[in-house]
Amino acid sequence: FADKVKGILEMYLGGQNIGTAEKALLFGEANPSGKLAETFPEKLSHNPSYLNFPGNMDDVDYAEGIFVGYRYYDEKGINPLFPFGHGLSYTTFEYSNLTVSENEIKDDKTLTVMVDVTNTGDRDGMEIVQLYVSDKESSVRRPVRELKGFEKLFLKAGETKKAVFHLDKRSFAYYEPDIHDWFVEYGEFIIEAGSSSRDIRLSTSVYVSSDTKLPVHFTLNTTCGEINSIPEGRAMFENILSQIDCGFGDTASDDLGASAKEMMEAMIRDMPLRTLVTFTNVPDITRAKMSEMVENLNEMLAEK
């Protein structure tokens, strides 16, 4: 019936005087301003825990990891019945002038975010402004967006107020097991202001950097792509590629050969270093030489 009515009043656990509150809202004596603190899926099977709950005997597997609630529906591209943060009002609100205090900050600093909200209707009302952050260039899997703050503003009809948010290191960080702490990866972060997780009104961006370095230690089980991911390892990766090219001959003499070379390089990026030793037509790549290159690279990184 949800698509056949103009509105649904969700009262949750309203308490002893819930009837008085319902009357005030239904007859327009008060303006509703609540927002959903959860996602309402269209089907039970859309729930992120559908395949794992209630588990096996006494064990429950929380396989959804960090992708719970709106994070799961955003990642999967599933349209929910009602999204996280959704809520209607008897008036309307317009968002404008989303600004950040800095365009680039260090992770030990605090970023101030401000957005103007205007009551564009003819009734007084309250709006809950939601602020989401997204890591645009993350090397680890993170949610499409994460709620990092919200502000409730009371606005008279036609009035404009400013919602102010303060984002610290935790607002941009993810938990990194290698350092047993929260870690901010350098890159661009998208700042979004919206009325719900699916009703994003404005966005801007900021670059965040950190002096914290993740420990790096390579072995023969490290892939060539991981070696190539850091500046110190790129020379080693290029050396490996050049030796393989020599072993296989000139693979780039025509368009077909160029495609084959590109495909081989992509394949090599996913190979552990120990696998390269099996290339019998590349005699210069031996286990001993690979071990020496890895040891030299680790020593170089340790000196930094």
Task: Set out the residue ranges of the language-model regions.
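Extended, compositionally biased non-globular segments
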Residues: Q243-K304
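Intrinsically disordered or highly flexible coil/loop and linker segments, enriched in small
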Residues: I18, N79, T120-M126, R198, ...
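Intrinsically disordered, low-complexity Ser/Thr/Gly-rich stretches
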Residues: H46, F67, K76-G77, S89-P215
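Low-complexity, Pro/Ser/Thr- and charge-rich linker/hinge segments at domain boundaries
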Residues: S209-S229
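Sec/Tat-exported extracytoplasmic proteins
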Residues: Y12, E29-A30, F40, D74, ...
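Short, solvent-exposed coil/turn linker segments
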Residues: S101-E104, D168, T219-E226, S259-M267, ...
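Secreted, periplasmic, or luminal enzymes acting at the cell surface/secretory milieu
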Residues: F1-D124, Y186, E192-A193
